[in-house]
Each structure stands twice: as structure tokens, then as C-alpha cells.
């Protein structure tokens, strides 16, 4: 059975003390680059090398347990149940935020104003030639908050793509770099847009690269976002199912049905506001 090395990042004495039992702490106490959030300690770990090819690795933020309701035992049990069949295992909460948007980039633009063009440019930088405007993502390939566990091969490609974004943001001197480093609204405060770009790279890899086999922990069994969409659990299920059907069969009727249902739901939400 493949071993799972699952880390919880800590950046203060308080978050160090809150590392959940069963997870290994990943030290970011020096927190040299808080502007990169979790990417900085994950990057340092991966660049150091020494990963076991048959093992799984995960790097969770201090908010993992609060956002998912999962402890280390349940995460590791899911890894064991998979039996090494998958390259990537997903633990994404907020099912409503997976089902309603066409993809995680649209979801990000809904949450962070004026970021869609930056997301698009970043996606094209990471995966040149990707048809960004036709990307459809669902619960089988959407990753929130870097809550995933994967084998080293996936992590290496993830790091390679993220480093393209990292290099542009660090070098500066372009409008794209400025927008990556620019703060956007987040949790009542602000965070650089590049943080939310990095959080979407795993989803992009899974949607664009069919070579990766992924399995998702049931997202409907994890906490939802608390948005107005949570009033419509049946419709959320239908929306996600239609996207999955479209991804597997490419019949345009599934995507048309998704947009029609989403449009009707949008009308209901607008009426509820008035």
C-alpha cells in the first residue's frame, strides 16, 4: 500500500500548535515570503527533492480541518481505499462553488473582481495553447485551496507550471506581473492575485491533461460555502452532473442544458434579492 506523507503548514507558534494529529508539520515559521502564502513552503519542500516515487504527498494549510471537517485518519483512509489506483486524490469543499461556475477560473473571477483576464493569461502561460474559453470543470477535477494529495510525478509538473507564474511575478516589469502581484479582496482583507492563480493550477492540469487519474472525496459530504447557492442542493447536483456528462461524452446538449439550468437558477437568485 503506498505511503502518504501529508503535511500541515504552520507559520506561527499558534498554527504550529494546531497541526492536526496524524499530519506532519511543515515549518514555515520564518515566513520569508508571505506574499506567496502556502506556495512558498511547498515550493521549498519540492525543490529539496528526495520524494519517494510510489508515495503520495500533500501540503495542507492550517485551515484544512476547519474547511473540510476531515481529520488525518479520514484523509489517510481515503488514500488507502484508493489502493494506489489514482495519481491525485482531491479533498475539495464548497460543492456549490464547484457546480455553479463553468470552471474554477470563472469561480475565482466571481469572488475576486477584475481577475478573469489575469487568470486567462496565467492559464495560457502554464499550458500554452489551452482553449481557455472552452474549459469546463466539475467535481472530478476541481481543487480548492491546494487540498489534494498526489504522487511525485504530478507534483513535479505542478511545480514546473507554477514556476512559470512565479518567474513572471518575481521579475516584474510587465502589466501581467503587476496584476499577479496586485492585491484582490479575500476574507475581508486582501491577498495577491498570484496566490489564487497558483491555487488553480492543479485543476488546470487535471482538466487539460487526460493522463492524470484523479479521484475525489465526495464533495457533497464536505462543507458548502454558505452562499445563496446552498439553498439549491438538487440544482447543484444537476449542474455538476451535466458538466461531468459533457466532459465524458462531449455532446453539446449537456453543456447547453447546464447553461439553461444555471440561467434559470440565476433568475431565481435575482428575484430573491428584490
Describe each model-derived feature in a short phrase.
Residues 1-274:
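ER/Golgi luminal nucleotide-sugar-dependent glycosyltransferases, focusing on the catalytic module
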Amino acid at each position: 500500500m503506498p505511503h502518504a506523507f501529508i503535511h500541515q503548514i504552520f507559520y506561527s507558534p499558534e498554527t504550529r500548535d494546531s497541526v492536526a494529529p496524524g499530519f506532519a508539520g511543515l515549518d514555515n515559521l520564518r515566513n520569508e515570503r508571505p506574499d506567496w502564502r502556502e506556495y512558498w513552503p511547498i515550493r521549498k519542500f519540492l525543490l529539496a527533492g528526495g520524494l519517494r516515487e510510489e508515495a503520495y504527498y500533500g501540503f495542507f494549510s492550517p485551515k484544512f480541518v476547519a474547511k473540510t471537517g476531515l481529520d488525518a485518519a479520514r484523509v489517510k483512509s481515503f488514500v488507502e481505499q484508493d489502493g494506489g489506483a489514482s495519481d491525485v486524490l482531491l479533498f475539495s469543499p464548497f460543492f456549490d462553488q464547484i457546480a455553479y461556475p463553468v470552471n474554477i477560473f470563472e469561480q475565482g473571477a466571481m469572488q475576486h473582481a477584475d481577475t478573469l483576464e489575469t487568470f486567462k493569461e496565467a492559464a495560457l502561460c502554464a499550458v500554452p495553447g489551452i482553449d481557455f474559453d472552452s474549459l469546463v470543470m466539475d467535481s472530478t477535477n476541481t481543487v480548492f485551496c491546494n487540498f489534494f494529495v498526489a504522487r511525485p510525478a504530478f507534483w513535479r509538473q505542478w511545480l514546473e507550471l507554477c514556476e512559470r507564474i512565479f518567474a513572471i511575478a518575481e521579475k516584474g516589469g510587465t502589466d501581467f506581473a503587476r496584476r499577479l502581484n496586485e492585491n484582490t479582496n479575500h476574507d475581508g482583507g486582501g491577498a495577491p492575485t498570484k496566490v489564487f492563480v497558483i491555487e488553480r493550477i492543479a485543476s488546470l492540469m487535471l482538466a487539460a491533461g487526460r493522463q492524470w487519474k484523479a479521484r475525489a472525496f465526495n464533495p457533497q459530504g464536505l462543507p458548502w460555502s454558505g452562499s445563496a447557492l446552498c439553498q439549491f442542493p438538487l440544482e447543484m447536483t444537476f449542474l455538476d452532473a451535466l458538466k461531468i456528462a459533457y466532459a465524458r461524452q462531449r455532446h453539446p446538449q449537456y453543456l447547453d442544458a447546464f447553461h439553461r439550468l444555471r440561467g434559470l437558477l440565476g433568475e431565481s437568485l435575482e428575484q430573491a434579492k428584490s
